[in-house]
UniProtKB/Swiss-Prot annotation:
Keywords: Cytoplasm, Methyltransferase, RNA-binding, rRNA processing, S-adenosyl-L-methionine, Transferase. SMART domains: THUMP. It catalyses: guanosine(2445) in 23S rRNA + S-adenosyl-L-methionine = N(2)-methylguanosine(2445) in 23S rRNA + S-adenosyl-L-homocysteine + H(+); guanosine(2069) in 23S rRNA + S-adenosyl-L-methionine = N(2)-methylguanosine(2069) in 23S rRNA + S-adenosyl-L-homocysteine + H(+). GO terms for cellular component: cytoplasm. The keyword Transferase applies. The keyword Cytoplasm applies. GO terms for molecular function: 23S rRNA (guanine(2445)-N(2))-methyltransferase activity; RNA binding; rRNA (guanine-N7-)-methyltransferase activity. Specifically methylates the guanine in position 2445 (m2G2445) and the guanine in position 2069 (m7G2069) of 23S rRNA. PROSITE patterns: THUMP, UPF0020. This is Ribosomal RNA large subunit methyltransferase K/L. InterPro entries: 23SrRNA_methyltr_KL, DNA_methylase_N6_adenine_CS, RlmKL-like_Mtase, RlmKL-like_Mtase_CS, RlmL_1st, SAM-dep_methyl-trfase, SAM-dependent_MTases_sf, THUMP_dom. It comes from Yersinia pestis (strain Pestoides F). It holds the Pfam family THUMP.
Length: 706
C-alpha cells in the first residue's frame, strides 16, 4: 500500500476527495491544497490517469526536522536515491517554503540537489544530470516552519496539462479547474452543454471527455514515473489499454452534444484544433459568433446546461462594456434558454449581479491568484425577456426625469456638453455628464466606512441603469473614479488613447478628451462664465491665467478680443489650447500661448490687460512651483499682483472651486480694489443642485483708483 498526496487548487479539496474515493482510494484526508490518501500500485496509476481534479500526485519519501541548511542536506541524503532512479536519468528539484534558516527557495533547491548528487557519487562514483526542462525525475520538497517533506512527483508536468491544448486564447482556465466547474454546474453526461464565450474550448472539451468516458491523462506524452526504478510498465500498459477501449466505446455511446461560440475566429480555430487532439471533435460544434447573436441550438429540446467563464475587467475603461454584456446575456438566457441550467465562473461577482438572475447555488474557488465565484441558476421560460425591476430603480427614475428636462434645455441653449446627474441621491454618488453622443460617469470615491464590494456593486448598478435609460451603446459610456485631488495629482494622466472629440458650446468648438485625464478639458460648471467673458472682451486685451485648455481664451477670441494671452505651466494643456484656438480660426500673433508658472509670470511681467480671467487651483504643490499655493490663504497676494496688470477700467473675473471660500473684502479694499460676487449669475440649470461647485467674483479698481 502506498501513501500518496494529491494536490489541487484551493477550494477543490472536497471534490478531489470524492473523486479519489470513487477510484478506490483509502483513508482520504483533506488538508489545505490537497488530499492525503492510501492505495496500491493500481490505484496509484489510476489516480494519475483518471483524476480530472488533481494538480499533481506525489509519493512521499521522507519527512524530517530542519533547523539549519545542514539538517536539510542530511535529511535529503538519507534517502537511498540510487534505488529510486538511475544515474543516467535527469532530475529537477522543486522547492517551496522558507523558515528562519532557509530563507530562499532557490537556496533550498540547491542544497537538495547537492544532497542527491552527493548520494550518487558516494555510492556509485557517478552523478546524474540536472535538467530544468522536462526532466526524467522531479523531486518535490516542501518546507513549513521546521518540518521538510520530500516526495517523488509522479506527475512530471502538472496533471492539468492533458496534452491536447498546445494553443490558447487569452486568460485560459486550467483543465482541472474547468473539470471542477463542470462537476459543480449540475450538468449531467448525456445532456447538451453550451458555452457561448468558449475561448479555446477548455470547458467544452473537458465535459466532452467526461461524457465519452475518456481518461484525462490518455493524451499525455510525458510522466514523472516512467524513469522511476519501481515503475510497473506492464500494469501501466494494461491500464492505458483499458482506458483507450473505454474512450472508443464512450465516444460511440454518448448522447451528449456540445456547442461553443466566441467572437474571435482565431481562438475558435484553436478550440477546434484542441478538440481534435483530445479526440472529441465530433461531439462539439464550434462557431465564431458575437454573443449578441446567440441562439439556442436545440430550441425543441432536450434541455441542457449553459456553462461559461465570461470575461471580467481589470481596467476601469472595460467595465461599461462588460456590464452591458452581462446584462444582455442575462436577458438572452431568459428568452432563449428557458428550462435550462446556467453556471458561470467569474472573478467578479458584481458583474454576475448584472445578469439580474437569482442564483440557487454558489461556490468559491481560486483561479491562480484570483478569488473567484461560481454561481448556478435555474432558468425559467420567459419568451418576452421581461426581467424583474430595473436595477438602481430610484437612480434610473431620477436620471430619466433629469434627461427629459435638461436635454430640451441644452438644445435651446445651443450646448452639447452638460451635467445630467450630480449625486442627486446619496446612495448613488456619481456625476453623469453628456458630451455630444458620449456620456461620462464619474464615481466620487466612497468613504472608507463603505464596504468596497458594496460600493462597486452600486457603481455597476448605476452603469447598467445609465445604459438602459439613455439607450446608450456601451462603447459610448466612459467610466472614471474621481477622488479629492491634491496638488500634483490634480492633472494626473490616466490613459494614453489620444482620442479627442470635437463638441460645441454656444458658438465655440472645443476639443475634449474623455479617457486620458481625470478631467475632460472642459469645466462644465464654468460655461456661463466663459460666455460672459466673450461678451466682456470685444476690442479688449484678454489674459487667461491657469488657463488649462484655453477654453476661456476661445470665447474671448470669438467675442472679438483684440488679443488673447493664455498662460499655463503644462505644455500638454497649452498644446491642447492651441488646438482649441486653431479649430475656431483664432491664429496669429495676437493669440499668444505662454508656458510658465503663473505666479512667477505675474511677478515678472509689465504688460497690462483689459480683461483678466483667473481660475487657480484650490491648492497646488507642483514640482515646477517654488512654493505651495492655497487659494484661501494667498488670494490677496494674487490680487495685489493682478492689480498692476489691470488697466484702469479693466475687470478681473476671479473664480475658484474651494467650498466655503471667504473673500477678504477688507483686504481687497485696502489694495484699492472692489470685489462683487457673481456666483449666482454663473451657475446654470444643470448645476442647480450644486450651488457650491464654484464661486465667482468680478474685481475692478475702486472709484478712487480710477
Amino acid at each position: 500500500m502506498n501513501s500518496l498526496f494529491a494536490s489541487t487548487a484551493r477550494g477543490l479539496e472536497e471534490l478531489l476527495k470524492s473523486e479519489l474515493e470513487a477510484l478506490g482510494a483509502h483513508d482520504c484526508k483533506i488538508v489545505q491544497g490537497g488530499v492525503h490518501f492510501q492505495g496500491d500500485d493500481r490505484l496509484m496509476y489510476q489516480s494519475l490517469l483518471w483524476s480530472r481534479l488533481a494538480s499533481r500526485i506525489l509519493l512521499p519519501l521522507n519527512e524530517f526536522k530542519v533547523y539549519s541548511d545542514l539538517d536539510l542536506y542530511l535529511g535529503v541524503q538519507a534517502i537511498d536515491w540510487p534505488s529510486i532512479f538511475g544515474v543516467d536519468k535527469t532530475f529537477a528539484v522543486h522547492f517551496s517554503g522558507v523558515n528562519d534558516e532557509i530563507r530562499n527557495s532557490q537556496y533550498g533547491a540547491l542544497k537538495v540537489k547537492d544532497a542527491i548528487v552527493d548520494s550518487f557519487t558516494r555510492k556509485m562514483d557517478q552523478r546524474p544530470t540536472v535538467a530544468k526542462q522536462q526532466p526524467d525525475i522531479r523531486v518535490n520538497v516542501f518546507l513549513q516552519r521546521d518540518m521538510a517533506s520530500v516526495a517523488l512527483d509522479l506527475s512530471g508536468e502538472g496533471l492539468h496539462q492533458r496534452g491536447y491544448r498546445d494553443l490558447t486564447g487569452q486568460a485560459p482556465l486550467k483543465e482541472n479547474l474547468a473539470a471542477a466547474i463542470i462537476q459543480r454546474s449540475g450538468w449531467q453526461p448525456g445532456t447538451p452543454m453550451v458555452d457561448p464565450m468558449c475561448g479555446s474550448g477548455t470547458l467544452l472539451i473537458e465535459a466532452a471527455m467526461m461524457a465519452s468516458d475518456r481518461a484525462p491523462g490518455l493524451h499525455r506524452g510525458h510522466w514523472g514515473f516512467t524513469a522511476w526504478n519501481a515503475f510497473n510498465e506492464a500494469l501501466w500498459r494494461e491500464l492505458t489499454t483499458e482506458a483507450q477501449v473505454r474512450a472508443r466505446r464512450g465516444l460511440l455511446e454518448t448522447s451528449s452534444r456540445f456547442f461553443g461560440s466566441d467572437i474571435d475566429r482565431r481562438v475558435i480555430e484553436m478550440a477546434r484544433a484542441n478538440a481534435r487532439r483530445a479526440g472529441v471533435a465530433e461531439l462539439i460544434t464550434f462557431n465564431a459568433n458575437d454573443i449578441s447573436k446567440l441562439v439556442n441550438p436545440l430550441p425543441e429540446g432536450p434541455v441542457g446546461t449553459v456553462i461559461s467563464n465570461p470575461p471580467y475587467g481589470e481596467r476601469l475603461e472595460s467595465e461599461p462594456a462588460l456590464i452591458a454584456l452581462h446584462n444582455m446575456f442575462g436577458r438572452m438566457m431568459k428568452t432563449a434558454f428557458g428550462g435550462w441550467r446556467l453556471s458561470l465562473f467569474s472573478a467578479s461577482p458584481e458583474l454576475l449581479s448584472c445578469l439580474q438572475l437569482r442564483a440557487d447555488r454558489e461556490f468559491k474557488a481560486k483561479n491562480g491568484p484570483l478569488d473567484c465565484v461560481q454561481k448556478n441558476y435555474q432558468l425559467t421560460a420567459n419568451p418576452l425577456g421581461a426581467g424583474g425591476a430595473l436595477v438602481a430603480e430610484d437612480y434610473a427614475n431620477r436620471l430619466r426625469k433629469n434627461v427629459k428636462k435638461l436635454d430640451k434645455w441644452a438644445k435651446q441653449q445651443g450646448i452639447e456638453c452638460y451635467r445630467l446627474y450630480d449625486a442627486d441621491l446619496p446612495d448613488y454618488n456619481v456625476a453623469v455628464d453628456r458630451y455630444g453622443s458620449k456620456v461620462v460617469v464619474q464615481e466620487y470615491a466612497p468613504p472608507k466606512t463603505i464596504d468596497p464590494q458594496k460600493a462597486r456593486q452600486r457603481l455597476f448598478d448605476v452603469i447598467n441603469a445609465t445604459l438602459a435609460v439613455l439607450e446608450l451603446p456601451s462603447n459610448q459610456l466612459v467610466l472614471k473614479t474621481r477622488e479629492r485631488q491634491k496638488g500634483k495629482n490634480q492633472y494626473e494622466k490616466l490613459a494614453q488613447k489620444g482620442e479627442f472629440l470635437l463638441v460645441s458650446e454656444y458658438n465655440a468648438k472645443l476639443w475634449v478628451n474623455l479617457t486620458d485625464y481625470l478631467d475632460t478639458g472642459l469645466f462644465l460648471d464654468h460655461r456661463i462664465a466663459r460666455q460672459m467673458l466673450g461678451k466682456m472682451s470685444q476690442g479688449k486685451d484678454f489674459l487667461n491665467l491657469f488657463a488649462y485648455t484655453g477654453t476661456a481664451s476661445v470665447h474671448a477670441g470669438l467675442g472679438g478680443a483684440r488679443s488673447t494671452t493664455t498662460v499655463d505651466m503644462s505644455r500638454t494643456y497649452l498644446e491642447w489650447a492651441e488646438k482649441n484656438l486653431r479649430v475656431n480660426g483664432l491664429t496669429g500673433q495676437q493669440h499668444r500661448l505662454i508656458q510658465a508658472d503663473c505666479l512667477s509670470w505675474l511677478s515678472n511681467t509689465d504688460e497690462q490687460f483689459d480683461v483678466i480671467f483667473i481660475d487657480p487651483p484650490t491648492f497646488s504643490n507642483s514640482k515646477r512651483m517654488e512654493t505651495t499655493f492655497d487659494v484661501q490663504r494667498d488670494h490677496l497676494v494674487l490680487m495685489k499682483e493682478l492689480k498692476w496688470l489691470l488697466r484702469r477700467k479693466g475687470t478681473i473675473m476671479f473664480s475658484n472651486n474651494k467650498r466655503g471660500f471667504q473673500m477678504d473684502l477688507a483686504g481687497i479694499a485696502a489694495l484699492g480694489l472692489e470685489a462683487k460676487e457673481i456666483t449666482a449669475l454663473t451657475q446654470s440649470e444643470d448645476f442647480a443642485r450644486n450651488r457650491q461647485i464654484h464661486n465667482c467674483w468680478l474685481v475692478t479698481h475702486s472709484q478712487e483708483e480710477k
